[in-house]
Amino acid sequence: MKKDFNFLTLALGVVLAATSVHAQTGARATGATPATRAQTVAAANLLASLPASEAVMSVDVRRLLSDALPRAYNNNPAELARINAEIDKFKASTGLDARTIERLVVGVSYQQTATGKTLVETVALARGNFRAASFAPSKSRMQEQKYAGKTIQVFNVDTQVKLIGLFNMRVTDVAVAMLDANTVAVGKLERVRAAIDASAGRGRVSPEITALATRDANALVGMGGNIPASLTQNLDMGNISKSIASVRQFYSTLGTTANGFNMLTALRTENAGAAQSLSTMITGLKQLAPFALGQMPAARQRPLRTLVDNSKVGAEGNDVLITLELAQVDVAALIDAF
């Protein structure tokens, strides 16, 4: 059976669930080696090239493909073949091959409609070894236009594809523009235009936002951003809503260990009192988790129980802190269960 649930879905899903759940303390980049410092600089420089965004994410794609994904899927040939098929599908549609990307950053903006619905708009900047001439897909319709001296190719994809074949941000119309010899912008047309402006120094993302995503020099994935009031103001869960609405920012990292993976997310609230209240609420929900898990199929109960048991919750200043460490076999079991 084809699964839309994948390792990145797991990672990002736990982080998003942490908007009522996950974290760890500040920067863990102490004792950074020259190599990790170089990684931090590379991530920060590419993130700084994003257009204005409410939240950002940085991914070490080379490590993701060569190490993290094979480990997360326990080197399952069928699952790894499925991932490669998704990568090839996006390549066939746009000409962009994830295997040529070294690092990817994503900028997210929120747009509220007149009806109060919040729309999420994304743009990705990929840095790697590729050529503009390679963007010549055979299975999609393409239009070309000029903007601020750059060429934008807009592809109409016949079927929905994952962004670069890895991320569950499914797109049908994909705009692609080379920003320089080694950097390409991918996303909705309006956001790609904004990325072109940002590459020229206009309307860039706030340094405060990018700093949240680069707290850990060794992270496989780092992310951070603001939590707009529009995302939480309509929650109707009593005191729980009040606690969640106190969150102003978040940051999170996903890393690898000798035996598996670790994750952190910090939920930054408006004051220390709010952080303590939210921490207490999450701890209470964690204690109730076994009752909810008992209603699930047995195949899902065990990996989810391991996830809950291995998470730790606390408060430090204005931050709610939650850590999670999972062995490789537990990550593989969680993915397999979904």
Where are the predicted features?
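One face of beta-strands
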Residues: 57, 122-126, 248-254, 259-267, ...
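Structural boundary/hinge residues at secondary-structure and domain interfaces
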Residues: 24-166, 170, 213-243, 278-310, ...
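Short, solvent-exposed coil/turn segments at beta-strand boundaries
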Residues: 52, 119-121, 149-150, 177-184, ...
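A conserved glycine-rich beta-strand in the N-terminal activation segment of trypsin-fold
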Residues: 168-233
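Small-residue helix/turn framework positions
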Residues: 229, 239, 251-273, 277-289
